[in-house]
């Protein structure tokens, strides 16, 4: 597969393509790894520099510093790290300017990556690409205009995002969402997980209280209280809690006080492929899920698991968000499918009573979300060219010929 347009100068025989690529959290690292693989497939003579995690390092990147330093979320959480982040921003921008790459690609993490892009643009004409469009369709639409001052090209994960970016003056391509590339768990995978966890044939409720420490701290107690209301009506149901390594101990402490003898699906000590398989099997085995807001709703949709979404942030972030949010749902399944079938308990509505009531409603009619979940996967690109390769082609297609 070759770029659809003229082959860029940097991709011609005998010319090394130089790419500075920057990711700030695990989801961005996975996007970056797939994009790097796609770029190498289309343009074998490519050199990478930048910041990333295991997925990008497996594609040949030597990260300039640990990506974990950048995994910060929320207005209040960023403040204590401000001066350290400011130093890293300056260091990274200087590294880009010293490399003089054909393109700099930043992936999500806008608090960090767009500040790097601003310093780079102030001092050079280096082409900038940002992977993952900001959710200007949800809140703070003015971010697109500010972003257009430092970003030339956006790679969007969601099909409705390009017009928002283009109106601000940036080039934008929908390249598909990585969730569509995940293999489905087989019946054998699900049976093996049930046996391993001692679930037998019991119905399963999947609980996902977040992948960041602040999320777990805020959501896990509320989830536990909701389960105390919901589970007495469903005494045979087992609670399964997939975790990510960096919050596994924190989640284990929290769920120890939950009812229903919850079982953790812990990836620590496993090879990445095995850990991913167990997570997919847990999602597919579940009869319903209670999850924090975010990309996890798409993972559940990919597995066909009906869900309730719940989320709360700290008081200050909540008050700021209330003044800026412009949409009536934050769940990506609802947005992509243009439905509102996935119930939400957000902010002040994130209470045990509300969550338990919505779990009961979803459990009573689990098929109500099926059509929306299938449509979501179709619109995100399931069955088509892998998003990493589509993203790589989009980057190359828009480089100067």
From Swiss-Prot:
Catalytic activity: a lipid X + a UDP-2-N,3-O-bis[(3R)-3-hydroxyacyl]-alpha-D-glucosamine = a lipid A disaccharide + UDP + H(+)
Protein family according to the UniProt entry: Belongs to the LpxB family.
GO cellular component: membrane
NCBIfam families in UniProt: lpxB
The encoding gene: lpxB
InterPro entries, A to Z: Glyco_trans_19
Species lineage: Bacteria, Pseudomonadati, Pseudomonadota, Alphaproteobacteria, Rhodobacterales
Keywords recorded for this protein, A-Z: Glycosyltransferase, Lipid A biosynthesis, Lipid biosynthesis, Lipid metabolism, Transferase
Organism this protein belongs to: Ruegeria pomeroyi (strain ATCC 700808 / DSM 15171 / DSS-3)
Protein name per the record: Lipid-A-disaccharide synthase
GO biological process, one term: lipid A biosynthetic process
Domain of life according to the entry: Bacteria
């Amino acid at each position: 597969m070759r770029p659809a347009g003229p082959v860029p100068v940097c991709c011609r025989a005998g010319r090394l393509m130089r790419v500075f690529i920057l990711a700030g959290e695990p989801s961005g690292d996975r996007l970056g790894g797939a994009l790097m693989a796609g770029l190498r497939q289309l343009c074998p003579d490519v050199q990478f520099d930048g910041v990333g995690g295991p997925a990008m390092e497996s594609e040949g990147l030597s990260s300039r510093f640990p990506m974990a330093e950048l995994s910060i979320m929320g207005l209040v959480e960023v403040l204590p790290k401000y001066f350290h982040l400011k130093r890293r921003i300056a260091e990274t921008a200087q590294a880009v300017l010293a490399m003089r790459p054909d393109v700099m690609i930043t992936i999500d993490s806008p608090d960090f990556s767009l500040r790097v892009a601003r310093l780079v643009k102030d001092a050079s004409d280096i082409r900038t690409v940002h992977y993952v469009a900001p959710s200007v369709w949800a809140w703070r639409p003015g971010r697109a205009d500010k972003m257009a001052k430092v970003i030339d090209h956006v790679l969007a994960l969601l099909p409705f995002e390009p017009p928002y970016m283009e109106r601000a003056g940036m080039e934008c391509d929908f390249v598909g969402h990585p969730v569509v590339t995940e293999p489905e768990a087989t019946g054998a995978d699900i049976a093996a997980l049930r046996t391993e966890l001692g679930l037998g044939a019991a119905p399963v409720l999947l609980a996902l209280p977040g992948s960041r420490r602040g999320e777990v701290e805020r959501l896990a107690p509320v989830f536990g209280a909701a389960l105390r209301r919901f589970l007495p009506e469903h005494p045979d149901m087992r609670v399964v809690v997939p975790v990510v390594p960096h919050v596994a101990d924190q989640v284990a402490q929290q769920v120890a006080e939950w009812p229903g003898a919850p079982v953790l699906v812990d990836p620590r000590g496993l090879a990445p492929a095995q850990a991913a398989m167990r997570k997919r099997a847990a999602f597919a085995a579940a009869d319903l899920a209670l999850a924090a807001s975010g990309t996890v709703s798409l993972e559940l949709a990919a597995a066909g698991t009906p869900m309730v979404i719940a989320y709360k942030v700290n008081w200050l972030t909540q008050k700021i968000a209330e003044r800026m949010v412009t949409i009536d749902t934050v769940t990506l399944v609802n947005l992509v499918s243009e439905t509102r079938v996935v119930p939400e308990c957000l902010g002040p509505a994130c209470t045990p009573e509300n969550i338990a009531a919505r779990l009961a409603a979803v459990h009573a009619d689990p098929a109500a979300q099926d059509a929306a979940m299938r449509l979501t996967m179709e619109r995100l690109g399931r069955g088509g060219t892998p998003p990493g390769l589509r993203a790589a082609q989009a980057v190359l297609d828009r480089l100067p010929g």
